[in-house]
Amino acid sequence: MKLIVGLGNPGREYELTRHNIGFMAIDELAKRWNISLNEQKFKGMFGAGFVNGEKVILLKPLTYMNLSGESIRPLMDYYKIDLEDFIIMYDDLDLPVGKLRLRMKGSAGGHNGVKSTIAHLGTQEFQRIRMGIDRPKNGMKVVDYVLGRFTAEEMVDVNHAIEKAANACEEWLNKSFLQVMNDFNN
């Protein structure tokens, strides 16, 4: 069984914001794999299905970003999901819009949703797909930037990145994460 989590904030006012690119990637996987995110439990919206013979759970924590670990840990405990069967997808200010970086482990890098996940799991040793949103320009505050929407021009790159992240997740069902990293970190 595999768990794929996308980080974001709940509520219509946060839809399509930079901070919600993880939710957008989960929505793409749900559509692609015909998985309904219709279960509300573990402080999140989730759904499960079979993809290439592998049971997959997709989760969007509904705790707000800074408390994401409160949703992820109980679900992992309930379904007895090992760290190697878990991927988290989230926005990254240090990557250009549309770029992905897959990592096997690492610090939170200033991301509060990842910080919460590390705190609740008790380790940094989990796989992740960092999705670039770039840094704010013209002195804009980071909080205003990440809670702002992508421009129409950026959405072209964002949609490509979401598709690429979904492809990486799909490949991960049949390959090791290290192999997927080698294929997608180029």
Curated annotation (Swiss-Prot):
InterPro entries: Pept_tRNA_hydro, Pept_tRNA_hydro_CS, Pept_tRNA_hydro_sf. Hydrolyzes ribosome-free peptidyl-tRNAs (with 1 or more amino acids incorporated), which drop off the ribosome during protein synthesis, or as a result of ribosome stalling. Catalyzes the release of premature peptidyl moieties from peptidyl-tRNA molecules trapped in stalled 50S ribosomal subunits, and thus maintains levels of free tRNAs and 50S ribosomes. One of its GO terms (molecular function) is peptidyl-tRNA hydrolase activity. Its EC number is 3.1.1.29. It catalyses: an N-acyl-L-alpha-aminoacyl-tRNA + H2O = an N-acyl-L-amino acid + a tRNA + H(+). It comes from the Bacteria. It is found in: Cytoplasm. One of its GO terms (cellular component) is cytoplasm. HAMAP family: Pept_tRNA_hydro_bact. Belongs to the PTH family. TRNA binds at residues 14, 64, 66, 112. It comes from Bacillus cytotoxicus (strain DSM 22905 / CIP 110041 / 391-98 / NVH 391-98). The record marks 9 as: Discriminates between blocked and unblocked aminoacyl-tRNA. The record marks 91 as: Stabilizes the basic form of H active site to accept a proton. NCBIfam families: pth (TIGR00447). Keywords: Cytoplasm, Hydrolase, RNA-binding, tRNA-binding. Pfam families: Pept_tRNA_hydro. The keyword tRNA-binding applies. It is an enzyme of class 3 (hydrolase). Monomer. This is Peptidyl-tRNA hydrolase. PANTHER family: PEPTIDYL-TRNA HYDROLASE (PTHR17224:SF1). The lineage of its organism: Bacteria, Bacillati, Bacillota, Bacilli, Bacillales. One of its GO terms (biological process) is rescue of stalled ribosome. The active site is at residue 19.
